[in-house]
Amino acid sequence: MLTLTQGKKIVNALRSRLAFEYNGQLIKILSKNIMAVGSLRREEKMLNDVDLLIIVPEKKLLKYVLPNIRIKGLSFSVKVCGERKCVLFIEWEKKTYQLDLFTALAEEKPYAIFHFTGPVSYLIRIRAALKKKNYKLNQYGLFKNQTLVPLKITTERELIKELGFTYRVPKKRL
């Protein structure tokens, strides 16, 4: 367990330290492409882990980012890692914390932020309401009859509005 303040400190430190190896080169992940999600974004007082979403600029890079993740100046070990999710244990101020990393493409960003911010109970209610209208919502997009529904949105707030719901700041989602 860690406090919200500790979680924020870890995220701020990671913003300048995350990179991945690609074709023998170390590629820095831009701070603007790293965002806190999960309980940290909901500003819960106590956190089980730190969840970060990394926006990947090109689809071809997805398979390289997480499996080849590097954290400058921090000791870490990988528990499990794939193209879309990686669970690490990082050493921070003489303690070990779990860091969950997720990836999304730029066009998936609003959906991924919404999905990974949660909480699960809130997502279940939204998805149940959408299911009645034959829609499926996940971290990759909005689908109707298994077909992606193109929405001209760039933010989570626009997504919620487009779906016909009232936007709630993450802190107030139940």
Swiss-Prot record:
Lineage top rank: taxon: Viruses
Disulfide bridge partners, by residue number: 81-86
Lineage of the organism: Viruses, Varidnaviria, Bamfordvirae, Nucleocytoviricota, Pokkesviricetes
GO biological process: double-strand break repair via nonhomologous end joining
GO cellular component: virion component
Catalytic activity annotation: DNA(n) + a 2'-deoxyribonucleoside 5'-triphosphate = DNA(n+1) + diphosphate
Protein's UniProt name: Repair DNA polymerase X
Subcellular location: Virion
Protein family: Belongs to the DNA polymerase type-X family.
GO MF annotations, alphabetized: DNA binding; DNA-directed DNA polymerase activity; metal ion binding
Required co-factors: Mg(2+)
Keyword annotations of the record: Disulfide bond, DNA damage, DNA repair, DNA-binding, DNA-directed DNA polymerase, Magnesium, Metal-binding, Nucleotidyltransferase, Transferase, Virion
Record-linked InterPro entries: DNA_pol-X_BS, DNA_Pol_thumb_sf, DNA_pol_X, NT_sf, PolB_thumb
Sites annotated Stabilizes dGTP in a syn conformation to overcome the Watson-Crick base pairing constraint: 115
UniProt main location, coarse: virion
Miscellaneous section: Consistent with its intracellular location, ASFV encodes its own replicative DNA polymerase and three base excision repair enzymes: a class II AP endonuclease, the repair polymerase Pol X, and an ATP-dependent DNA ligase.
Enzyme class at the top of the EC tree: transferase
Record EC number: 2.7.7.7
Pfam families: DNA_pol_B_thumb
Entry function: Error-prone polymerase lacking a proofreading 3'-5' exonuclease which catalyzes the gap-filling reaction during the DNA repair process. Specifically binds intermediates in the single-nucleotide base-excision repair process. Also catalyzes DNA polymerization with low nucleotide-insertion fidelity. Probably acts as a strategic DNA mutase, which gives rise to a rapid emergence of variants. Generates mismatched G-G pairs, in that case, the polymerase first binds the deoxynucleotide followed by mismatch formation.
Residue positions binding Mg(2+): 49, 51, 100
Domain notes: Small DNA polymerase formed from only a palm and a C-terminal subdomain. The total DNA-binding site of pol X is composed of two DNA-binding subsites.
Cofactor, free-text remark: In the presence of magnesium, pol X shows a strong preference for the ssDNA gaps having one and two nucleotides.
Involved in ssDNA binding, as annotated region: 42-51
